């Protein structure tokens, strides 16, 4: 039997001490295996309490566990194949015993993402929806959960499928213009086709011009804290993280390398980066820390510029959030464009957290419609829009048709309809085993 059709199994629940472990099973012959393991198949999609037995020809049957068994006959299953779930007691010996019994019956352990890959192969979902499921598993916040669930439910796929259907119709009209140039076609057909192509390309461009908000929400933002030595950057990192993540010292230049901490601000995952103090130095190690600090400033989604006097550090982006620390020693002057805080006393920290949360939400909030969520999607749509732009510039009907066909192919790769074999290992390799 080809390996892609063999029955596979895997734990769908995490490792460690627990009451229940869920074992999933799918593939050709799954029903026969289940009957040898627990007797007659239970009614489809209904939980039944069954004894699970290891049956060897040379020995008496051995009871492995009493478990809830669910049977999902294909194609109405997650993978589209005959599938089952075994809700076991989660003891390591129980799990190992059932796994050994399944191997003896002809199943093999699943690879990461193999259940979802089979669902894709059987048309149960497309590549965009599969990636949405992966994002749903990884979601850390409510905002990420909503975005991932929309994608897994097909919200993005419906947009892209709609584009593909429109482009397919326009390509048919273009082929008619090529094949029947002397026929009495309705007047204005070619201009209407060009107008529709222009409108379709404009929709794609509007989808691309979203500021990368969906991608930023999916991966999380990066906020970099910068400032001169000893202004309280490490103390601020610790305060925002709620723990002592960075060493705090009165000695200037204590922080040499960047320190990264993951927090949630405004329901958005944010990586806070504490950097070396910005100053001229002859110390090679500290100078390297300063160079890395400037690198993180350049690549940050938001810069938190920290100071304890009236001078903001140089080379800071105009949209940086300016924070003046140690207001317990010198208050912020009236009208100053800075949030005044005292990390040591906690003064102003609520206002700063609010400002950071608002910035995080502003950087990830989608203005209208579901956003792009991956660089792969962006590249495919950019390629599609590029071919449409080339088609609009073509005066030869045959060349215009060829550009439209290339656009169809690029759009098909987006959802996995065409030419994505080289992508599948990358996409499904990101899943956990059991999904």
Swiss-Prot record:
One GO MF term? GTPase activity
Q: Which UniProt keywords apply?
A: Cytoplasm, GTP-binding, Hydrolase, Magnesium, Metal-binding, Nucleotide-binding, Potassium, tRNA processing
Q: Identify the EC number(s).
A: 3.6.-.-
* Keyword Nucleotide-binding tagged: yes
CC cofactor? K(+)
Give each disulfide bond as a residue pair.
none
Q: Which residues bind K(+)?
A: 230, 249, 251, 254
- Tell me the compartments it is located in: Cytoplasm
Identify the residues that bind (6S)-5-formyl-5,6,7,8-tetrahydrofolate. Answer: 24, 85, 124, 435
UniProt: GTP binding residues: 230-235, 249-255, 274-277
| One GO-annotated biological process of the protein | tRNA wobble uridine modification
- EC class of the enzyme, as a word: hydrolase
Which amino acids does the record list as binding Mg(2+)? Answer: 234, 255
* Domain TrmE-type G residue range list: 220-361
Write down the PANTHER family for this protein, in alphabetical order.
TRNA MODIFICATION GTPASE GTPBP3, TRNA MODIFICATION GTPASE GTPBP3, MITOCHONDRIAL
Described purpose of this protein according to its UniProt entry: Exhibits a very high intrinsic GTPase hydrolysis rate. Involved in the addition of a carboxymethylaminomethyl (cmnm) group at the wobble position (U34) of certain tRNAs, forming tRNA-cmnm(5)s(2)U34.
Q: How does it assemble?
A: Homodimer. Heterotetramer of two MnmE and two MnmG subunits.
Q: Which family does it belong to?
A: Belongs to the TRAFAC class TrmE-Era-EngA-EngB-Septin-like GTPase superfamily. TrmE GTPase family.
Q: This chain belongs to which protein, by name?
A: tRNA modification GTPase MnmE
| Gene this chain is encoded by | mnmE
């Amino acid at each position: 039997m080809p390996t892609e059709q063999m029955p596979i199994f895997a734990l769908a629940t995490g490792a460690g001490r627990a009451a229940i472990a869920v074992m999933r099973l799918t593939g050709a012959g799954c029903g026969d295996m289940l009957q040898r393991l627990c007797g007659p198949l239970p009614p489809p999609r209904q939980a039944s309490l069954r004894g699970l037995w290891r049956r060897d020809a040379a020995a008496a049957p051995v009871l492995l566990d009493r478990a809830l068994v669910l049977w999902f006959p294909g194609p109405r299953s997650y993978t589209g194949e005959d599938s089952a779930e075994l809700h076991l007691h989660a003891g390591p010996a129980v799990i190992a015993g059932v796994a050994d019994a399944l191997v003896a019956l002809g199943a093999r352990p699943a690879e990461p993402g193999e259940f979802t890959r089979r669902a894709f192969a059987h048309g149960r979902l497309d590549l965009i929806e599969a990636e949405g499921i992966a994002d749903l598993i990884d979601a850390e916040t409510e905002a990420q959960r909503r975005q991932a669930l929309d994608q897994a439910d097909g919200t993005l796929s419906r947009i892209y499928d709609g584009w593909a259907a429109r482009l397919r119709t326009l390509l048919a009209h273009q082929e008619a213009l090529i094949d029947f140039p002397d026929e009495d076609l309705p007047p204005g057909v070619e201009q209407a086709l060009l107008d529709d192509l222009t409108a379709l390309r404009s929709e794609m461009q509007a989808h691309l011009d979203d500021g990368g908000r969906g991608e930023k929400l999916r991966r999380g933002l990066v906020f970099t804290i910068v400032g001169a030595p000893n202004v309280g950057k490490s103390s601020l990192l610790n305060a925002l993280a709620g723990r002592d993540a960075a060493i705090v010292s009165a000695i200037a230049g204590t922080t040499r390398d960047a320190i990264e901490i993951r927090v949630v601000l405004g329901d958005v995952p944010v990586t806070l980066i504490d950097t070396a103090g910005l100053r001229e130095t002859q110390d090679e190690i500290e100078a390297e820390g300063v160079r890395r600090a400037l690198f993180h400033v350049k690549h940050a989604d938001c810069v938190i510029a920290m100071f304890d006097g009236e001078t903001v550090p140089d080379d800071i982006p105009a949209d940086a959030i300016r924070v003046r620390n140690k207001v317990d020693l010198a208050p912020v002057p009236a009208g100053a464009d800075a949030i005044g805080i005292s990390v040591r006393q906690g003064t102003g920290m609520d206002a700063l957290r609010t400002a950071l949360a608002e910035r995080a939400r502003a950087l990830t909030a989608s203005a209208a419609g579901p956003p792009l969520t991956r660089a792969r999607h962006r590249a495919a749509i950019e390629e599609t829009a590029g071919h449409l732009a080339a088609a609009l510039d073509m005066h030869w009907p045959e060349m215009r048709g060829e550009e439209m066909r290339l656009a169809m192919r690029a759009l098909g790769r987006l959802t996995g309809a065409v030419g994505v074999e080289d992508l599948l290992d990358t996409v499904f390799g990101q899943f956990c085993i059991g999904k």
